[in-house]
């Protein structure tokens, strides 16, 4: 077929509503023209007498599918009877069962990998389940080919575990949905499209990349799409139409184009975490010092909230069974560990469970703040997952605060000659400059100092670019755009401040050095009190 795109329809669980499905397909084709293929995931057959009678009309030839239809094998014991073979076969005219697992390659070169059924939890495996051997038999021949780049389409009955990581959230909480074996399969096969069913949910995840930025060659992106059940009462989407040119027929430059909303691969972290969990399963005594002991009188109107979080007795503490990873301990006095006597507590604005916000000492502006972990972590890439999650909440809340004041938030971190993470959050008045002006100022001044400041995709996980221990400087703009520089030597410690204080941004060059901006303790207390009051409507920690 050359470079002519194939027109494909994908469908969720049919559950025996075959007439309803094909009536819908006929209507689509009447309106939009003929499609080449229909792919069905989840349970195709139903177990009711009505469903059996409906199928009989297609099996006998009294009715015919209006399009070449490929379905997965059984995903429940009740429907095994409809499949004469686990190896795949034609069940009726225009309806083909692909089988338990394998690769289907069409005349056009379109490559479809598939795994039918649910993950087996017993031996011998029931006929509607797949085993680790099935996964190995599918993956091994493909990965042994040095020219393997991925498959065009992956069809699975079950969801991959952790697919929502880094992505948009589905309509219902699917955090513990799916299985790790399918996640591992998707990570290895790198499908351009991955369809799954069984959950009765429609979810189109943001596309994710299959390479590590700045460390691996650019590869094509993957899209995961879960589809609902045919004719579901909530009218959730169960059919998905798309055009696809087989990978083997595509120009490599076109194939690896990255959409703007691409995210990190959701499965790499899952695999790493899985290994860590297995390695540390016996470590039950490591427990992070609870943040509930850190309560200061921050001059709030309601003294019982004590900065805003309820005091929790040992018996009242939620998630008491959780034992988060203990952060590294400082080797000496630390000015930023919240439990440390060195902390200037009058500067604290808000305290969460794992992070806190404090007024910057000698700030660029009166509302310049620091976002910091309560425990001793050196950089963003060192943070435990629960700390990262709360740090993101603080970033989001402070951005909303800035927007309400007619300002845009610029975040930057210098992981160089510092022992405790300080994420600088600086509000820049919108009338002063645009986001593009700020970006250009950073790029220009970096170039002047012979530093290669690189723009990286908005959803990039810094851990993949800068492993723990790597000195770096990074900026995050209000649009989500990020700039990154791997520090080599002689990095100017005030670089972030100098750029924001420059004529091109806020035009306050005299404030580029924090030591020149120090004020009395009394003035600091007044500033902190004002920021605390202004920020209060956005402080999620007050509700915890």
UniProtKB/Swiss-Prot annotation:
Residues 255-331, 521-544 are annotated as: Disordered. It holds the Pfam family CwfJ_C_2. GO terms for molecular function: RNA lariat debranching enzyme activator activity. InterPro entries: Cwf19-like, Cwf19-like_C_dom-1, Cwf19-like_C_dom-2, HIT-like_sf, Metallo-depent_PP-like. Residues 266-279, 521-535 have a biased composition (Basic and acidic residues). Gene3D superfamilies: HIT-like (3.30.428.10). Disruption phenotype: Morpholino knockdown of the protein causes reduced swim speed and abnormal touch-evoked escape response. Morphants exhibit abnormal cerebellar structure. SUPFAM superfamilies: HIT-like (SSF54197), Metallo-dependent phosphatases (SSF56300). GO terms for biological process: mRNA splicing, via spliceosome. GO terms for cellular component: post-mRNA release spliceosomal complex. Belongs to the CWF19 family. This is CWF19-like protein 1. It comes from Danio rerio. The lineage of its organism: Eukaryota, Metazoa, Chordata, Craniata, Vertebrata. The gene is cwf19l1.
């Amino acid at each position: 077929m050359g470079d002519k795109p194939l027109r494909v329809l994908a469908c969720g669980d049919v559950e025996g509503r075959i007439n309803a499905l094909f009536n819908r397909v006929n209507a689509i084709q009447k309106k939009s023209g003929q499609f080449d293929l229909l792919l069905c995931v989840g349970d195709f057959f139903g177990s009711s007498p009505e469903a059996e009678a409906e199928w009989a009309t297609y099996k006998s030839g009294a009715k015919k599918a209006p399009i070449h239809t490929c379905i997965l094998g059984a995903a429940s014991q009740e429907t095994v009877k409809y499949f004469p073979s686990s190896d795949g076969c034609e069940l009726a005219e225009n309806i083909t069962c692909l089988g338990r697992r394998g690769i289907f390659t069409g005349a056009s070169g379109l490559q479809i990998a598939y795994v039918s059924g649910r993950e087996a939890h017993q031996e011998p495996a029931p006929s509607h389940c797949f085993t680790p051997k099935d996964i190995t038999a599918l993956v091994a021949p493909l990965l042994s080919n040095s020219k393997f780049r991925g498959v065009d389409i992956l069809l699975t009955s079950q969801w991959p575990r952790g697919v929502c990581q880094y992505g948009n959230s589905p309509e219902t909480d699917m955090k513990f949905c799916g299985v790790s074996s399918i996640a591992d399969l998707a990570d290895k096969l790198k499908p351009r499209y991955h369809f799954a069913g069984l959950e009765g949910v429609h979810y189109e995840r943001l596309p994710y990349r299959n390479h590590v930025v700045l460390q691996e060659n650019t590869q094509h992106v993957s899209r995961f799409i879960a589809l609902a059940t045919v004719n579901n009462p909530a009218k959730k989407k169960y059919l998905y139409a798309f055009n696809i040119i087989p990978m083997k027929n595509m120009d490599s430059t076109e194939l690896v184009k990255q959409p703007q909303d691409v995210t990190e691969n959701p499965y790499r972290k899952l695999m790493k975490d899985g290994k860590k969990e297995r390695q540390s399963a016996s470590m039950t005594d490591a427990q992070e010092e609870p943040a509930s002991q850190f309560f200061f009188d921050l001059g709030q109107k309601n003294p019982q909230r004590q900065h805003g979080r309820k005091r929790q007795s040992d018996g009242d503490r939620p998630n008491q069974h959780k034992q988060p990873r203990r952060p590294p301990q400082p080797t000496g006095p630390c000015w930023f560990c919240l439990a440390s006597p060195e902390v200037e507590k009058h500067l604290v604005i808000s305290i969460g469970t794992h992070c806190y916000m404090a007024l910057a000492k000698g700030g660029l502006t009166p509302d310049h703040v620091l976002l910091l972990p309560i425990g001793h972590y050196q950089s963003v890439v060192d943070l435990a997952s629960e700390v990262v999650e709360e740090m993101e909440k603080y970033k989001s809340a402070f951005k909303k605060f800035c927007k309400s004041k007619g300002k845009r938030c610029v975040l930057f971190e210098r992981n160089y000659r510092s022992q405790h993470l300080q994420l600088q959050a600086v509000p820049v008045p919108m009338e002063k400059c645009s986001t593009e002006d700020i970006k250009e100022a950073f790029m220009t001044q970096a170039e002047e100092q012979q530093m290669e400041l690189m723009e990286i995709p908005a959803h990039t996980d810094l851990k993949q670019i800068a492993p723990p221990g790597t000195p770096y400087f990074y900026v995050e703009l209000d649009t989500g755009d990020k700039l990154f520089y791997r520090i080599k030597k002689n990095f100017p410690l005030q670089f972030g401040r100098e750029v924001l204080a420059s004529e091109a941004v806020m035009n306050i060059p005299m404030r580029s050095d924090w030591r020149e901006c120090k004020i009395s303790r009394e003035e600091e207390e007044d500033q902190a009190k004002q920021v605390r009051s202004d920020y209060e409507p956005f402080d999620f920690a007050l509700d915890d």
